[in-house]
Amino acid sequence: MAAAAPVAADDDERRRRPGAALEDSRSQEGANGEAESGELSRLRAELAGALAEMETMKAVAEVSESTKAEAVAAVQRQCQEEVASLQAILKDSISSYEAQITALKQERQQQQQDCEEKERELGRLKQLLSRAYPLDSLEKQMEKAHEDSEKLREIVLPMEKEIEELKAKLLRAEELIQEIQRRPRHAPSLHGSTELLPLSRDPSPPLEPLEELSGDGGPAAEAFAHNCDDSASISSFSLGGGVGSSSSLPQSRQGLSPEQEETASLVSTGTLVPEGIYLPPPGYQLVPDTQWEQLQTEGRQLQKDLESVSRERDELQEGLRRSNEDCAKQMQVLLAQVQNSEQLLRTLQGTVSQAQERVQLQMAELVTTHKCLHHEVKRLNEENQGLRAEQLPSSAPQGSQQEQGEEESLPSSVPELQQLLCCTRQEARARLQAQEHGAERLRIEIVTLREALEEETVARASLEGQLRVQREETEVLEASLCSLRTEMERVQQEQSKAQLPDLLSEQRAKVLRLQAELETSEQVQRDFVRLSQALQVRLERIRQAETLEQVRSIMDEAPLTDVRDIKDT
């Protein structure tokens, strides 16, 4: 029984083990499924984040493209406006230059016309003088012609003598050349300086026939050495021949002039050392000393002329610099004067406007006072006429009443009559005095009113004169201001013309800068496009991935922090 119990326990354990293994495998599968679902949800969240990031990047790219397009359009508009303004400035400058050229042409034509008129006037005056004094002019012309002929004769005679002498020398030289050509080939060469040969001092013999003769020199001309003294002047020529020319020289000297004999002797002495004769290298030419000295003097003269021209150029440059400085100073002075004149004109305009307002107020007051005085005079005249008209009818009834009263109350005695007479006389005198006082008062009032009216008219005339003077002054100041403004505009135009190259260079620099900015913006746009393409490619790879490992490997790739990291696909 004891042995059967352990066996049963082992069987139970064996039965329990497969169930536990199944439960463990199920729990592991559940854990794996949960992990895979969590990983899948995480990947889905990352995919959603990547999609959202891609959408935001697309939106940013679209916004940047729109802003870039707007900026490029604004830059292009600004460039077009600047180019149009430059073209307008250039057109204005060209039109101003053309106007100046036409004005200068007109001035030149006017000057030519003035010169022609002056010449015609001078010719007319000469004709008038010749008509007025014909004998004197003819005598003067004859004397002048005689003096001119004498001067020409004095100039021509020495020239003719020189020509004759030169012809004689030329004939002697040609005869000598012919004699030398007729000799047999015995004279090898002719060598001498300007101090020995008279032919070297004669400018008449040309070098061309000498060079032709030197071409027939034979082997002796080829054997000449170049070790002679450079300071010796070569003015002769070389002929072909041998060493035995000394025996034939006495025969050739027969029938020659003394100068030719001297030349022949010099030839005989010069032929002794043929190695000392200097032949110029090809491309060079031997010239006489006189011609060499003449060339040196011409060179010195040209050097002096060049120095004088350089000095004149320096002086002109200095004068131009001074004139530019003076022009700048004058410009500053003109600008200061223009500013002062504008300020003075503003002050004068203010004073003139104030004076005009005061004059207008005074004129209005004078007009009102004139009207009041006119009405007062009219009223006083009417009152005077009314008083005069009232006195006549009032005197008539008073007289009738007095007559009636007198008739009623006539005095009965002489003293009463005398007393009545005195009373009537006093009353009449008082009435006359009152009338005279009233008339005098009216006359005084009329005179005072007339004087006031005259004073007002004089004041009005003086004010009108002051106003006229001030208007003339303002017109003069406005004209001077207009002239100063035109001068200032001309100076500003000159300054703007001088500043046009600088402005053009600035505009070119600005255009280059804008082009660089445009290129950078285009590069940024291309970088955005490449980045969006790379993101789209990565998203497409994620979509085409078959397993989670491929998706994880794609997501674990290096993040796109720089556009240079994007591989071109």
Swiss-Prot record:
The keyword Phosphoprotein applies. Gene3D superfamilies: 1.20.5.340, Single helix bin. Residues 245-257, 393-403 have a biased composition (Low complexity). One of its GO terms (biological process) is regulation of cilium assembly. Residues 1-41, 180-265, 388-411 are annotated as: Disordered. SUPFAM superfamilies: G protein-binding domain. Keywords: Acetylation, Cell projection, Cilium biogenesis/degradation, Coiled coil, Cytoplasm, Cytoskeleton, Endocytosis, Endosome, Phosphoprotein, Protein transport, Transport. The modification N-acetylalanine is found at residue 2. InterPro entries: Rabaptin, Rabaptin_coiled-coil, Rabaptin_Rab5-bd_dom. Heterodimer with RABGEF1. The dimer binds RAB5A that has been activated by GTP-binding. Interacts with SDCCAG8; this interaction is important for ciliogenesis regulation. Interacts with RAB4A; this interaction may mediate VEGFR2 cell surface expression. Plays a role in membrane trafficking and in homotypic early endosome fusion. Participates in arteriogenesis by regulating vascular endothelial growth factor receptor 2/VEGFR2 cell surface expression and endosomal trafficking. By interacting with SDCCAG8, localizes to centrosomes and plays a critical role in ciliogenesis. This is Rab GTPase-binding effector protein 2. It comes from Homo sapiens. The gene is RABEP2.
